[in-house]
From Swiss-Prot:
GO biological process: auxin-activated signaling pathway; defense response; negative regulation of defense response; negative regulation of defense response to bacterium; negative regulation of defense response to oomycetes; negative regulation of reactive oxygen species metabolic process; protein import into mitochondrial matrix; regulation of auxin polar transport
Keyword vocabulary terms for this entry: Auxin signaling pathway, Cytoplasm, Membrane, Mitochondrion, Mitochondrion inner membrane, Plant defense, Protein transport, Transit peptide, Translocation, Transport
Organism: Arabidopsis thaliana (Mouse-ear cress)
Gene: PAM16L2
Family label: Belongs to the TIM16/PAM16 family.
Protein name: Mitochondrial import inner membrane translocase subunit PAM16 like 2
An annotated GO cellular component: mitochondrial inner membrane
Topology of the protein relative to the lipid bilayer: Peripheral membrane protein
Organelle targeting peptide span: 1-27
KO phenotype (gene knockout): Reduced growth, especially at high temperatures (>21 degrees Celsius), as well as warped and twisted leaves at the later rosette stage. Increased resistance to thaxtomin, a phytotoxin produced by Streptomyces bacteria, due to reduced toxin uptake. Enhanced tolerance to 1-napthylphthalamic acid (NPA), an auxin efflux transport inhibitor which blocks polar auxin transport. Increased tolerance to isoxaben (IXB), a cellulose biosynthesis inhibitor (CBI). In single mutants, enhanced resistance against virulent pathogens (e.g. oomycete H.arabidopsidis Noco2 and bacteria P.syringae pv.
Induction note: Induced by heat, salt and drought stresses.
Subcellular location: Mitochondrion inner membrane; Cytoplasm
Function: Regulates ATP-dependent protein translocation into the mitochondrial matrix. Involved in the uptake of thaxtomin, a phytotoxin produced by Streptomyces bacteria, that causes dramatic cell swelling, reduced seedling growth, and inhibition of cellulose synthesis. Modulates polar auxin transport. Involved in importing a negative regulator of plant immunity into mitochondria, thus protecting plants from over-accumulation of reactive oxygen species (ROS) and preventing autoimmunity. Confers sensitivity to virulent pathogens such as the oomycete H.arabidopsidis Noco2 and the bacteria P.syringae pv.
Length: 116
């Protein structure tokens, strides 16, 4: 009997606390949107997410120099991408892919032929 009563108190108490936390969160969001804090936080998040890797980082990831031909870069890219696909590392695959994209933009802007 005491266990049942205790279980009911715990369930009811957690429901009340859950609703209070939810209402406090909604109120905090409303206050933040009035003061512009939410807008600023969102803009900072977008700004940070939009940062691309530098050419130097891309070259380090792929292990190439400035004098490396586009064909060699593609060979290194394919090898690294496949090796990380076997290991199941999506994070490393995405880093390798972003590095190739960065160098592709650099090669196109230099007019060294259109990378394929």
């Amino acid at each position: 009997m005491a266990g049942r009563l205790l279980a009911n108190l715990i369930v009811m108490g957690s429901g009340i606390i859950g609703r209070a936390v939810f209402q406090a969160y909604r109120q905090a969001l409303a206050n933040a949107s009035k003061s512009g804090v939410a807008q600023e936080a969102m803009q900072n998040g977008v700004r940070q997410a939009g940062k691309a890797i530098t050419e130097q980082e891309a070259r380090q990831i792929l292990g190439v120099t400035e004098k490396t031909s586009w064909e060699e870069i593609l060979q290194k890219y394919d090898k690294l991408f496949e090796n990380n696909a076997k290991a199941g590392s999506f994070y490393l695959q995405s880093k390798v892919h972003r590095a190739k994209e960065c160098l592709e933009v650099v090669y196109r802007s230099q007019g060294n032929g259109t990378p394929s």
